[in-house]
């Protein structure tokens, strides 16, 4: 699985004018299941992100996790993280997991983040979403499992 993690002061996701999820300080996690991914990859990535120390401590160093700070997570599916731009001008997405697998792994990933004690909001898999965020830092990190 692939994830793009952004430290945010706030974030929200809207579908057809309805706000599905919003958080205050925490992480916006854009996530994509890849061909061949399974439950093990979803679990491993969620565990790593839950422990990722990208929030400042009292000394101003990135030494605290979202759990340590009492922050939340907004998890949004984004198959475009599987983009292959190596040829031509139009990206290919054949490396993404099939939609049924992608949705199952997306839901599992979000559930695993929540099981780590992190308040978790989500978007809607496969929907045309509007995502708003206020970056903090900015801090943006790419992870794969």
Curated annotation (Swiss-Prot):
Its EC number is 3.1.1.96. It is an enzyme of class 3 (hydrolase). GO terms for molecular function: D-tyrosyl-tRNA(Tyr) deacylase activity; Gly-tRNA(Ala) deacylase activity; Ser(Gly)-tRNA(Ala) hydrolase activity; tRNA binding. The keyword S-adenosyl-L-methionine does not apply. One of its GO terms (cellular component) is cytoplasm. A Gly-cisPro motif from one monomer fits into the active site of the other monomer to allow specific chiral rejection of L-amino acids. This is D-aminoacyl-tRNA deacylase. The lineage of its organism: Bacteria, Pseudomonadati, Pseudomonadota, Alphaproteobacteria, Rhodobacterales.
């Amino acid at each position: 699985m692939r994830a793009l993690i952004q430290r945010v002061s706030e974030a929200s996701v809207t579908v057809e004018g309805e706000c599905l999820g919003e958080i205050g300080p925490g992480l916006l996690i854009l996530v994509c299941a890849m061909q061949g991914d399974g439950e093990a990859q979803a679990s491993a990535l969620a565990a790593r992100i839950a422990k990722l120390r990208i929030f400042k401590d009292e000394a101003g160093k990135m030494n605290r996790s979202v759990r340590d700070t009492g922050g939340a997570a907004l998890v949004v599916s984004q198959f475009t993280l599987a983009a292959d731009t190596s040829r031509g001008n139009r990206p290919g997405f054949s490396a993404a997991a099939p939609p049924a697998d992608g949705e199952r792994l997306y839901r599992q990933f979000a559930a695993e983040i929540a099981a780590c004690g992190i308040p978790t909001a989500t978007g809607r898999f496969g929907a045309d979403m509007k995502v708003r965020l206020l970056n903090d830092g900015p801090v943006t990190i790419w992870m794969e499992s």
